A protein has these predicted regions:
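Beta-strand-rich modules
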Residues: 805-824
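Pro/Thr/Ser/Gly-rich low-complexity, intrinsically disordered linker/stalk tracts
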Residues: 748-776, 810, 823-841
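Short, solvent-exposed loop/turn segments enriched in Ser/Thr/Gly
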Residues: 858-867
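Recognizes extended acidic, P/S/T-rich segments that occur
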Residues: 781-811, 829
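A surface/secretory-pathway sequence property marking extracellular, secreted
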Residues: 891-929
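Extended ligand-binding clefts on enzyme/binding-domain cores
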Residues: 47, 118-252, 262-266, 289-705, ...
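Asparagine-centered strand-capping/turn motif at beta-strand->loop junctions
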Residues: 870-875
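Terminal connector regions
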Residues: 948-996
Length: 996
């Protein structure tokens, strides 16, 4: 790239005034932190955090869900601004991670995860509502029935033909063994947050937010051609007796009532990426880190071919069913999906992967976190760590294979040509048996033309480069690939990105050089610019030609001289800008971590990042950083292009009949026989939007249907997209964390913030303390008192976020606080924690043993769900009707309770439970649950076990428990293990365990 100096933006004065306005009282959320911030970038991060969390700004719904956008009239991936996506949730986690880093308050991160689990991960999160009610009927030996994909929506519905038998799912058994069931712990990708479509949440009607879907009909189905439909379809809406299912698939009989969810793999991977950084920045709550591990365990379904066909076997048009992991491409595919039946005959379920892998969906940081012990999030299933180890290398190879001669990353690859396992075209380049595809998944517009699909994934590669360099791994092949890809990409992209200058283009968006010639690729182009103080410009689109060479390994890679890109259409997308700045920042920091100082390119990247951050701040309107967007595509609100098959008519959630009375005949050249409706025919409620009249007037006065041009300018909108704002906010934070903090920055160092409340665990003559580490702290001082509130006496100092106090007397309650220190000074004390050490009694051990586990890692919900297994270690049979289990807990508000046995190998009807209140409360217990067994449970032979017993308890008013201090609860026990804090009684005598 060619380097030119950056000018200081003239908007600094304006942005300083904006900063003063924000800090001086418009917002009330932790304004003291903004005032105390130690750098410009930290200040701006905290101000943007306040803007995002201020209820008056409208980023969140009444249920606390982040909207895709504050504004509602929009159509892109979501077709309405008050939808939300799994993408938005993953960005929310990232925001809260960096807020926790600055403030030491990690409760916001945990609240975000709880909200995600409640509203967009379709599991029973503790409210008793089963959102995957029939997943237990899934048969991993026959995951799903084949239906071909087609290029045009007009060619749908697709016949459920079973032409190709699905392969075997190799993950289901180990996931069941690890977690006790196969309820998929992944986000569904799309929510109708305000129930704007009107379908309602069938399986959890107390929620306003509703699981919905749109895209179902092939690569040419844009948002303008999609039909919104409920993910839980009992045929109330859609065609009578058929629901919406017959728009997408057809079979010999009417479709059954069903639920179905689709996961966007990039979003869940980003959530895991965020939790990795939380852990690196001092967060240590194993409950939520274990949830991230579990998500990563299930995310492996994104590595599998849609119908579990052997990878590469369809290159000749005849796929072979996979027998296990031979159906895994080890990349992040576009999606994975699962579903099942509803109602009394709904005893079936299915699961699919995806055959198409897009470079923009890969996440090497998540793969690192889930595979490397240093990453700290290796899932619990036996083969998960190895799968993610393979995936990490495979993803890095994928990027190397797809990098163009200039440096941009091409589209991706597929295991199913045209979505129907057709033979690969002659001469098609391959990658581990997958065929090169320049635009995987969708073609309207081509999926790899948007520059955001460059900035998103390469920012993650820049992170990995920094992580590996910081850990001293500068020689491995993984490091070499990460460095090569990000370095070449940064060098290419910086030629087309500008701060305080505006690039010169022609009428079609091509960059021009100083002679007025189009820049059509090549290395180190000299783009003509004009001075534009305070502006920023990044590319919007790319044009692709050629293909990579067939992959034969990193050592033989030739750099792809025949894969070329043309960079076009400079724009001002704030979200893309945020990701791009983070890519520059992590790359710059990585060069310093690798070599000890910034390389020449690293220094240029750091300076460009700073200039872009300063320029972007001038676009902050008090609600967020945003620019005016001309929407050339919004004529499509009025065109009729949503296909309905001939004779299909049904009810939409907004009360209208589909396809409506004004539909027009479809184009037979596209393969269908039906009609086309418009956006407003399908979603008439959009006409009530406050911006609709403006759009309609603009269309009537400016759109020329003959030339298909806006003769009086395209409609213009200003959007505050949640993900875009978070991308910008976190760009300020990461620059501050990696650049300012690393080199001292432009500000004076400050004393650290107070640690979070310590976790105090009492033992026999010992108390073990731990707390979240604090940014900038070099040591911690532990203080103790025997009276709550002090006065406290210093016990000692430690460089670690943990301390063991062995100078204690059993039976005495001790109160602890911790402060953090560095060369500048000492923080205030943490909140107080207490512990009472006690001698360890010896548990009873007879001829029965109790094993325990839980998959309930949320200790604050409204149910608890222990799972047990009784083992006969003696030499005589034991009748289970003579055995009782006692599980000790605190009720946290005395209310009537209900017992449920969800599953038992000995028969759920043979298991019953009663609740016994202790005469006097014990540590961690004021009640116990006593589980007993009927005669039908039979007896346990010597050496045998009872099989799994899954129980569930709730209060009748569904108020919450707090299990975190319950005597018998242990969130870390996710696999069956001996557990002495739940007891066994035989004929009334204690034969196993330790009572509180």
């Amino acid at each position: 790239m060619k380097w030119s100096a950056f000018k200081k933006p003239v908007s600094l004065l304006m942005s300083a005034a904006l900063s003063l306005t924000i800090v001086s009282g418009v917002f009330t959320v932790h304004s003291s932190q903004a005032l105390a911030a130690s750098s410009t970038e930290e200040t701006r991060f905290l101000q943007m955090y306040q803007q995002l969390k201020n209820p008056a700004n409208g980023y969140f719904s009444p249920e606390g869900i982040p909207y895709h956008s504050i504004e509602t009239l929009m159509s892109e991936a979501p077709d309405y601004g008050h939808m939300t996506t799994s993408e938005a949730y993953s960005y929310w986690l990232w925001l809260e991670v960096l807020y926790g880093h600055y403030t030491g308050d990690w409760s916001k991160l945990e609240a975000a995860w709880d909200n995600m689990e409640k509203y967009i991960i379709p599991v029973n999160e503790g409210d008793g509502k089963e959102e995957q009610p029939t997943m237990s009927y899934y048969n991993p030996n026959s995951p799903a029935t084949y239906a071909a994909e087609y290029s045009q929506p007009d060619q749908y519905p697709s016949q459920l033909s079973g032409q190709y038998a699905a392969g075997r799912d190799p993950l289901d058994a180990e996931l069941k063994a690890t977690y006790g069931n196969n309820q998929t712990y992944l986000m569904h990708w799309l929510l109708d947050v305000d129930n704007w479509y009107g379908f309602g949440n069938l399986l959890n009607p107390s929620h306003t937010a509703t699981y919905v879907n749109t895209f179902q009909r092939g690569e040419q189905e844009s948002v303008w051609e999609a039909i919104p439909h409920p993910s839980q379809d009992n045929k109330t809406f859609g065609k009578a007796g058929e629901g919406f299912m017959t728009l997408f698939t057809k079979e010999s009989n009417a479709p059954a009532e069903q639920w179905r969810y689709t996961n966007a793999t990039d979003a869940d991977a980003r959530a895991i990426q965020a939790m990795y950084w939380a852990k690196e920045l001092g967060y240590n709550n194993s409950v939520y880190l274990n949830k991230a591990k579990k998500m990563g365990d299930y995310l492996r379904y994104g590595m599998y071919d849609k119908y579990f066909q052997k990878i590469g076997s369809a290159s000749n048009g005849t796929p072979t069913a996979g027998t296990g992991k031979d159906a895994s491409h080890y990349l992040m595919a576009w999606y994975t999906a699962w579903g099942g039946g509803l109602g009394q005959t709904g005893n079936w379920a299915w699961r699919i992967g995806s055959s198409h892998a897009h470079q923009g969906y890969q996440n090497v940081v998540a793969a690192y976190a889930l595979s490397n012990p240093s990453g700290g999030l290796v899932p619990n299933s036996p083969t998960a760590g190895q799968d993610w180890t393979t995936s990490l290398k495979r993803q890095l190879e994928f990027y190397t294979w797809l990098q163009s001669a200039e440096g941009a990353i091409a589209g991706g690859a597929t295991n199913s040509w045209d979505g129907s396992y057709k033979a690969y075209p002659a001469g098609k380049s391959t990658f581990y048996g997958l065929a090169y595809d320049d635009a995987p998944v969708y073609h309207d517009p081509p999926s790899n033309n948007w520059f955001g699909m460059q900035a998103w994934p390469v920012e993650r590669i820049a992170e990995l480069y920094y992580i590996l360099a910081s850990n001293g791994d500068t020689s491995s092949e993984n490091f070499q690939m990460a460095k090569q890809v990000v370095q070449k990409w940064i060098d290419w992209s910086m030629d087309y990105v500008f701060a305080n200058q505006r690039p010169v283009t022609d009428s079609e968006g091509y960059y021009l050089d100083s002679l007025g010639n189009r820049v059509l690729g090549g290395n180190n182009p000299a783009i003509a610019t004009v001075s534009a103080p305070g502006e920023f410009w990044v590319p919007s689109n790319l044009e692709w030609s050629g293909q990579p060479a067939t992959w034969n390994g990193f050592s033989s890679h030739n750099g792809n001289p025949n894969l070329r890109v043309v960079t076009k259409n400079p724009g001002q997308d704030a979200g893309v800008l945020g990701s791009y700045i983070k890519a520059l920042t992590f790359f710059a920091a990585g060069t310093k971590a690798e070599t000890g100082s910034y390389t020449a390119l690293g220094s240029q990247a750091e300076q460009l990042a700073k200039a872009l951050l300063d320029a972007a701040w001038g676009y902050n309107d008090g609600i967020g950083i945003t620019t005016v967007e001309p929407r050339e595509d919004y004529y499509r609100y009025f065109t009729k292009e949503i296909y309905f098959p001939n004779g299909w008519t049904g009810l939409f959630g907004q009360g209208n009949t589909l396809p409506g009375s004004s539909a027009v005949p479809s184009d037979p050249a596209k393969g269908g026989n039906g009609v086309y409706a418009s956006y407003t025919d399908v979603r008439p409620a959009i006409k009530n939007d406050p911006q609709w009249q403006y759009l309609e007037n603009k269309y009537n006065t400016s759109w020329d249907p003959q030339t298909k041009k806006w003769t009086n300018g395209a409609p213009e909108f200003t959007y505050h997209r949640f993900w875009s704002q978070v991308d910008m906010a976190t760009a300020y934070a990461e620059y501050d964390r990696l650049i300012n903090s690393d080199q001292g920055g432009p500000v004076e160092p400050v004393a650290p913030k107070a640690p979070s409340k310590p976790n105090a665990v009492a033992g026999d003559a010992v108390v073990n303390l731990s707390w979240n580490s604090v940014s900038g702290a070099t040591s911690y001082t532990v203080k103790r008192a025997t009276t709550s509130g002090g006065p406290y006496t210093m016990l000692g100092t430690t460089a670690q976020a943990a301390y063991t106090d062995s100078n204690v007397v059993n039976g005495t309650t001790y109160y602890y606080v911790v402060s953090a220190s560095n060369s500048v000074g000492e923080s205030p004390d943490s909140p107080e924690a207490s512990a009472k050490p006690a001698s360890t009694p010896i548990p009873v051990q007879g001829n029965l043993k109790l094993e325990y586990r839980t998959n309930d890692t949320n200790p604050g919900d409204n149910q608890f769900r222990p799972q047990f297994r009784i083992v006969n270690t003696g030499d005589t049979a034991v009748s289970l009707s003579n055995v009782k289990i006692r599980y000790y807990y605190t009720i946290d508000g005395d209310k009537p309770q209900q017992f449920h046995c969800d599953y038992a190998a000995i028969g759920s009807s043979n298991v019953s439970g009663t609740f016994v209140k202790l005469p006097s409360a014990k540590p961690g217990a004021d009640y116990y649950l006593e589980i007993s067994f009927g005669a039908g449970a039979g007896s346990l032979a010597p050496g045998a076990n009872s099989g799994e017993i899954q129980v569930r308890v709730n209060k009748t008013d569904w108020s919450n428990y707090n299990e975190s201090d319950d005597y018998s609860y242990d969130a870390t026990k996710t696999n069956f293990a001996s557990w002495e804090k739940a007891t066994l009684h035989l004929n009334g005598d204690l034969v196993w365990g330790l009572e509180p």
